[in-house]
């Protein structure tokens, strides 16, 4: 079984395609349940952000697993398989591991080095764990990816600028407006990205912030935090959006709604109410940062005179979205090292059931021979029998110790699975027994030699 990744991201598709594919966190379970209906898939996890939709799965067969995941995403998005595959990328086995480690490290983000994706990977894994759709393979992979992401951020300066999609978008707005100090902002959405935008606006010296959200109480909580920074702020119901836009200089929308929140009519109303003209497009435009996925702003708004829209596509082409080359290289070196170590550990873990089955086979042979000895020498006293048993077990343990340790070392290298196969052939180990150990149905044999002391005989 190997890890298969099927994904679409800002690097492979335009925002319009990501919009169709976007999966709300509450729907992760439905997508994964459909994927797991196939006997070819044993584990699955969905990572869906404003920049990517990725399904990680443990599959028994590459092509079969790929067809299953592709069909589920095709049905979900309404896209045909042929259209979907134009924008999709596939990673398998080692490449899938490397990709997730890079994603968690911020190396594949629209803003290189941003830290928000690490939290998104953590939430994706937590959701899958809650839904019990991850097993040993994805559990270990996700945990290691989170560890790698933390290491990259702590050991490199890839995030030294503290950049994120939100900060880059607002920096672009700042330049277009000649500064945000004293300006009026409208913040649509009071979630994590909304809070991040509020913090950035406060640091930029924004004069006033109107927060709109479907849940007014949540908007009010964010308003209280904004006021603590000394910025004037108020909470408004989403129905007041058109009026709020009329007095705005900059708008940040990041709600996660399934359809546009900022309509063409809303912006038309705002422009008319504010008396903006076409000349304002260059002099003092209404800057709208659309950071939602699917998009929060009707695409037609970008065509209005006097409006400048910043979306994820525009953000990723901004120079400040790219970290210094030296920091990126340092991060990639860490990722490569961690990938090699992880894969070596996985290969070693895969040979362990075979080694355990060999030890079990040896233990069975020893017990059978001791029973034979009892039958041939029924008069052997208990003390002598125990000494013979300890001696035989020590001999077997010593004979097995060096080759089993060495086989684990050899198995950790690329192509190491051939050593486990050779071990099974040489000692005629039953594959069923090996599989039972791997599934936890048979105990791992602890030998006296490995424990550092002779094993006591069982009566």
From Swiss-Prot:
Record site: Important for activity: 99
Entry keyword set: NADP, Oxidoreductase, Porphyrin biosynthesis
Gene Ontology molecular functions: glutamyl-tRNA reductase activity; NADP binding
Record-stated family: Belongs to the glutamyl-tRNA reductase family.
Protein name, UniProt field: Glutamyl-tRNA reductase
SUPFAM superfamilies per the UniProt record, alphabetical: Glutamyl tRNA-reductase catalytic, N-terminal domain, Glutamyl tRNA-reductase dimerization domain, NAD(P)-binding Rossmann-fold domains
CDD domains per UniProt: NAD_bind_Glutamyl_tRNA_reduct (cd05213)
EC class name: oxidoreductase
Lineage, uppermost ranks: Bacteria, Bacillati, Actinomycetota, Actinomycetes, Mycobacteriales
Transmembrane segments: none
Gene from which the chain derives: hemA
Binding positions (substrate): 49-52, 109, 114-116, 120
InterPro entries: 4pyrrol_synth_GluRdtase, 4pyrrol_synth_GluRdtase_dimer, 4pyrrol_synth_GluRdtase_N, GluRdtase_CS, GluRdtase_dimer_dom_sf, GluRdtase_N_sf, NAD(P)-bd_dom_sf, Shikm_DH/Glu-tRNA_Rdtase
Subunit structure: Homodimer.
Organism superkingdom: Bacteria
Pathway the protein acts in: Porphyrin-containing compound metabolism; protoporphyrin-IX biosynthesis; 5-aminolevulinate from L-glutamyl-tRNA(Glu): step 1/2
EC number: 1.2.1.70
Function as written in the Swiss-Prot or TrEMBL entry: Catalyzes the NADPH-dependent reduction of glutamyl-tRNA(Glu) to glutamate 1-semialdehyde (GSA).
Additional facts recorded: During catalysis, the active site Cys acts as a nucleophile attacking the alpha-carbonyl group of tRNA-bound glutamate with the formation of a thioester intermediate between enzyme and glutamate, and the concomitant release of tRNA(Glu). The thioester intermediate is finally reduced by direct hydride transfer from NADPH, to form the product GSA.
Catalytic residue positions: 50
């Amino acid at each position: 079984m190997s890890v298969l990744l099927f994904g679409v991201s800002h690097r492979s598709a335009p925002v319009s395609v990501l919009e169709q594919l976007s999966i709300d966190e509450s729907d992760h379970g439905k997508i994964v349940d459909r994927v797991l209906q196939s006997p070819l898939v044993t584990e699955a996890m969905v990572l869906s952000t404003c920049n990517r939709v990725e399904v990680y799965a443990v599959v028994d067969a590459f092509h079969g697993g790929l067809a299953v995941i592709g069909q589920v995403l095709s049905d979900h998005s309404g896209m045909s398989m042929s259209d979907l595959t134009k924008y999709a990328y596939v990673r398998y086995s080692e490449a899938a591991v490397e990709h997730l480690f890079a994603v968690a490290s911020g190396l594949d983000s629209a803003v290189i080095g941003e830290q928000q994706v690490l939290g998104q990977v953590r939430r994706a894994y937590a959701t899958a764990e809650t839904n019990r759709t991850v097993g040993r393979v994805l559990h270990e992979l996700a945990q290691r990816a989170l560890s790698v992401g933390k290491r990259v951020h702590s050991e490199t300066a890839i995030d030294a600028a503290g950049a994120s999609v939100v900060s880059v978008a607002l920096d672009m707005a700042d330049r277009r407006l000649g500064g945000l100090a004293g300006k009026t902002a409208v913040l649509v959405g009071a979630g994590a990205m909304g809070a991040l935008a509020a913090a950035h606006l406060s640091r930029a010296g924004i004069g006033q912030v109107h927060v709109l959200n479907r849940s007014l109480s949540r908007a009010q909580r964010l308003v209280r935090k904004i006021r603590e920074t000394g910025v004037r702020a108020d909470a408004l119901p989403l129905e007041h959006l058109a009026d709020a836009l009329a007095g705005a200089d900059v708008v940040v929308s990041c709600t996660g709604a399934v359809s546009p929140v900022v309509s063409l009519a809303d912006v038309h109303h705002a422009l008319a109410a504010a008396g903006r003209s076409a000349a304002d497009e260059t002099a003092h435009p209404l800057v709208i940062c659309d950071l939602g996925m699917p998009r929060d702003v009707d695409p037609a708004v970008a065509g209005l005179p006097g409006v400048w829209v910043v979306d994820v596509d525009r953000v990723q082409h901004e120079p400040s979205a790219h970290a210094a080359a030296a920091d990126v290289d340092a991060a990639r070196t860490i990722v490569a090292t961690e990938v090699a170590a992880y894969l070596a550990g996985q290969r070693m873990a895969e040979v362990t059931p075979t080694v355990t089955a060999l030890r079990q086979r040896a233990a069975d042979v020893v017990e059978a021979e001791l029973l034979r000895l009892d039958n041939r020498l029924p008069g052997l006293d208990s003390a002598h029998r125990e000494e013979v048993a300890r001696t035989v077990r020590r001999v077997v343990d010593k004979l097995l110790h060096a080759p089993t340790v060495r086989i684990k070392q050899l198995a950790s290298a690329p192509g190491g699975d051939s050593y486990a196969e050779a071990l099974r052939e040489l000692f005629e180990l039953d594959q069923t027994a090996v599989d039972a150990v791997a599934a936890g149905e048979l105990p791992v044999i602890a030998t006296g030699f490995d424990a550092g002391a002779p094993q006591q005989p069982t009566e």
